[in-house]
Regions:
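Extracellular/lumenal glycan-associated surfaces
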Residues: 41-42, 46, 128-129, 133
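Intrinsic disorder/low-complexity detector
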Residues: 1-41, 66-126, 153-162
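Hydrophobic, well-ordered secondary-structure scaffolds
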Residues: 38-39, 55-57
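Amphipathic alpha-helical segments that form the core helices of the histone-fold
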Residues: 56-67, 143-152
Length: 162
């Protein structure tokens, strides 16, 4: 193997590691933004006060912990399936995180898939939290739609550099 081939192989491996690291950071950042969008949506549509905001946050964290335990017990695919089974009956239509720009390259498509997976998890924790707080299907759906709109607004601000 020539030195040039070895350097190229090393560069490809380093790029893969950086891509995985970036996807993980991307997933975490989107999860945080979607969490903020849900909190704002709950405040706007359900007229939350500080106590309800704190309870919602606690309930969402609890649902995330339940999911983590299920992942450890059953593996990620089965844990996701169980989460979808619990939350799907409460949704009128599937939640799909807005894309912003259409992805052209494979790494952009991978990043969008990661963002959508993170957004899906947060929204499902949000749905379970609202359900446990006694909100009905119509209230949950209107609040989820408001959270989606909030995320679209965030994308506009990000595009404008605000």
């Amino acid at each position: 193997m020539s030195i040039h081939m070895a350097q190229n192989a090393f560069a490809r491996c380093a790029e893969k590691v950086n891509t995985r690291k970036n996807l993980t950071l991307n997933r975490q950042a989107v999860g945080e933004v979607v969490s903020y969008c849900t909190m704002i949506a709950a405040n706007d549509t359900l007229d939350f006060n500080r106590d309800k905001q704190e309870r919602l946050c606690t309930e969402m964290n609890h649902r995330a912990e339940v999911y983590t335990v299920e992942m450890s017990a059953y593996g990620q695919p089965k844990a996701r399936e169980k989460l979808r089974e619990r939350t799907a009956p409460m949704l009128d239509k599937p939640f799909v995180l807005p894309a912003g720009q259409y992805p052209r390259k494979q790494r952009e498509k991978d990043a969008l898939a990661e963002r959508r997976a993170a957004g899906d998890l947060v929204i499902r924790f949000f749905i379970e939290a609202l359900d446990s707080m006694g909100y009905d299907r119509a209230q949950i759906n209107s609040t989820v739609e408001e959270a989606r709109k909030n995320y679209e607004q965030f994308l506009e601000w990000a595009k404008d550099g605000e």
